[in-house]
């Protein structure tokens, strides 16, 4: 019997539409993003992929997306687990900056290294910055020495994969249909793990907002079909292209 895993990046946020680096800054969905989350629910219903349990981050844009998707599926009553390990990548001192302006200031090579390389972190964010979450009470359980002030994708993999192995995998092995409502980079990290994508090739993977990505997994939780299947392939392709072009004005 195959396990069913649904990955859903949050709908468009207020800062996505402004082309800003968001990271751990807790912005909400905009009107378009709310519509994307409701459309995700329609796609799940059409495929009869009704979640039994949800794993999401501590950020409202992912939590809000999960709520709207579940409400649209009439599954608002199922358990929802929240973990900082599913948070977006912490973009350090880039948080709050416009992507196109950052690219123009630092050049395309540095911009792409910060944005898409596997192991290059952006500059650290000052702990007292208006865009810092270092003193946010929701992260009080993370030891101060481990609380990120900047992350690369490698760091996201290091925090996310243990959560997948310990928590999400247990639900999949119990036969539950699992929805992971998260973020572009935490989902890139998970897809990298599932599909065994190389450190070099992961740079080319872009996750669109609001389109469910469905994986069937075998008894070893390996994908039956590498790359999974988007429930709206055309919209996913267009969305991924838009993500790739975010450094452009």
Curated annotation (Swiss-Prot):
Site feature (Transition state stabilizer) residues: 183
Keyword rRNA-binding included in the entry's annotation: no
Record keywords: Gluconeogenesis, Glycolysis, Isomerase
Catalyzed reaction equations: (2R)-2-phosphoglycerate = (2R)-3-phosphoglycerate
Pathway the protein acts in: Carbohydrate degradation; glycolysis; pyruvate from D-glyceraldehyde 3-phosphate: step 3/5
Enzyme class at the top of the EC tree: isomerase
GO biological process: gluconeogenesis; glycolytic process
Pfam families from the UniProt entry: His_Phos_1 (PF00300)
PANTHER family documented for this protein: PHOSPHOGLYCERATE MUTASE
Annotated function: Catalyzes the interconversion of 2-phosphoglycerate and 3-phosphoglycerate.
Protein name: 2,3-bisphosphoglycerate-dependent phosphoglycerate mutase
Organism annotation: Cutibacterium acnes (strain DSM 16379 / KPA171202) (Propionibacterium acnes)
